Curated annotation (Swiss-Prot):
Name of this chain's protein: G protein-coupled receptor kinase 2
Gene3D superfamilies for the chain: Phosphorylase Kinase, domain 1, Pleckstrin-homology domain (PH domain)/Phosphotyrosine-binding domain (PTB), Regulator of G-protein Signalling 4, domain 2, Transferase(Phosphotransferase) domain 1
Effect noted on mutating residue 587 to Q: Failure to restore locomotion in animals lacking endogenous grk-2. Reduced ability to restore avoidance to the aversive compounds octanol and quinine in animals lacking endogenous grk-2
Catalyzed reactions per annotation: [G-protein-coupled receptor] + ATP = [G-protein-coupled receptor]-phosphate + ADP + H(+)
Record organism: Caenorhabditis elegans
Disruption phenotype: Defective egg-laying with mutants retaining 35 eggs compared to 13-14 eggs in wild-type worms. Reduced serotonin levels, increased levels of the serotonin metabolite 5-hydroxyindoleacetic acid, increased levels of amine oxidase amx-2 in early adult stages and reduced levels of phosphorylated amx-2. Defective locomotion and reduced body length. Exhibits dwelling behavior with decreased exploration in the presence and absence of food. Exhibits severe swimming defects with reduced body bend frequency in both early- and late-stage swimming.
Active site: 318 (proton acceptor)
Amino acid sequence: MADLEAVLADVSYLMAMEKSRSQPAARASKRIVLPDPSVRSIMQKFLEKSGDMKFDKIFNQKLGFLLLKDYAENVSESPCPQIKFYEAIKEYEKMETPDERLTKAREIYDHHIMVEMLAHAHNYSKESLQHVQYHLLKQNVPPDLFHRYVLEICDQLRGDIFQRFLESDKFTRFCQWKNLELNMQLTMNDFSVHRIIGRGGFGEVYGCRKADTGKMYAMKCLDKKRIKMKQGETLALNERIMLSLVSTGQDCPFIVCMTYAFQSPDKLCFILDLMNGGDLHYHLSQHGVFTEQEMIFYASEVILGLEHMHNRFVVYRDLKPANILLDENGHVRVSDLGLACDYSKKKPHASVGTHGYMAPEVLAKGVAYDSSADWFSLGCMLYKLLKGHSPFRQHKSKDKNEIDKMTLTQDIELPNEGLSKDCRDLLEGLLKRDVPDRLGCRGKGPTEVKEHPFFKDVDWQTVYLRRMTPPLIPPRGEVNAADAFDIGNFDDDEVKGVKLQDGDSDLYKNFNIVISERWQNEIAETIFEVVNQDADKAESKKRSKQKIKVAVEEKDSDVIVHGYIKKLGGPFTSAWQTKYGKLYPSRLELYPESLTAKPELVFMDQIEDVCAEMQTIKGETAIIVKLRDGFKEPKICLTNSDEISLKEWHTSLRTAHKVSQELLQRMGRKAIKIYGVNHDPMLSESERPGSVTRAFLNRASSVDSGV
């Protein structure tokens, strides 16, 4: 029965992989629904405050670029050829060979430069034109040939085109997507978990599928009780920090990166790139030792992975074949950053890693080190790929102390036969015991390793684009991992007496994260167009039913903020009711959700206070608006599942109330100076609420632009 279950788990996993590979969106079992377009009001303020309303911030986000492109090509009344020009250049920059680049460069010149020159519409500098012409004449086509044009294209786009985009519905759609991203709270329900594919000291790794996009990932689940039992909290949090460091910004195809991290009451979960091809240790045992030509491939991709880490001041500290994972096409990524360390502010001293791969300075007590440790480990790993064992396990010794002693004291004697001169020189350079003499530590970092004669035939751009041919391609249609029975299970009795306290939860309060760039790429590759089409239909249908229109409130009135918000109301004020709120300097208007009736009005002088701290009311974080005596309710409670909107409403309400109070106090003092008493003689007794302030607000509200 166990064998049958294992087979069924493998079949289910492989089917999910195949469908995710061809049509990931078709595998989505959960639909994304974008927030209402009114969220633009909130998001525009939020983006302005965070400095993210600038052209570069939006243009360099995947979804921002796609929506700006959509506006330029399908909405803008004036032609916008810059986008296609930009995309052609980006395609050129990814070309592998000089011949490919030359063909593409000539195509770009003919279709985007010459055509505009003939039409006297080439609005770019003479220097950019001459630079391209000169290099094309020489048939010299470096990847950055059109870099000057890219800068000028961006300068043109950030002008009138970008300003018109910000006033369009496409920017509203960007606000909707960004709001969705920033409010994401993942749980286990957002993933379909498949078979186990690995196990570590604190937990297991599973194959999984993201429910709303159909994309396959690896889910690394760490058990909080097991972490507590082994006092591994620092290690778990460090892995989360290191993964976010290497996963943010420019993507690295040679590191197993993280897209999400979230937690359940008993688990810490990392959502990582899924690698289906097994690890180099496994393939070394199956394939046997590699030739130098085969080893060059793995060395080149691993070097680019290390370069990515070192550029972010991260030292990996655990480089070995078992941590180098293959994808289904045979390309590799460095995995498991549990021992990685940020050395930007303080260099580490700890002796951590795997015996036989640790550098002498790591083994030496109290010695500070940095990226130097990884270059030594690289030498050890490459030696093992060529010879089948670590250079410090000549006699297959398993005595850790003996291995460490050899690492600290023994000069490596490379065999005379079986190694080329360049390969021997590379390994000797990487395995130097003295850090200043070691290759990679002489002042130029990864560059001096890449420039070593052993890699003289390597085109590093080709390596980066993953177009170098792998020496080994894992078998398709197989799960390249041990079966669940062999991987085994943890003994639950080990953690039976471990109790999680409130203080344990506090340790992980900042654990959750969404890596923006990677989430946006996932959306763009899967469901972006489908969700946009569904949202367009739903919004059009909703607008047709609304009797009260709220179009472009920001421009047509002095509304401070508007959008959907929930108010505690109903019988016995026991239920949260959805309202459409509009905040003006003098009042708060709360419309029914359908926008089919007049609003409930709350004037600023009726408000005693907007509490500085939000409170938990009926399980929701709520804004508390205290009202003055005589009002039918002692307070108004407002909430929103959208955390950004809730904070912006809270800030705006407090600010509006404070400003109105200051204004009313000034008006009161003026009345005393003019009339000698604190009242307005223009009001009758029936109109006077007790001070001049209400009269002022009533008159002010009559001139506010309403609905």
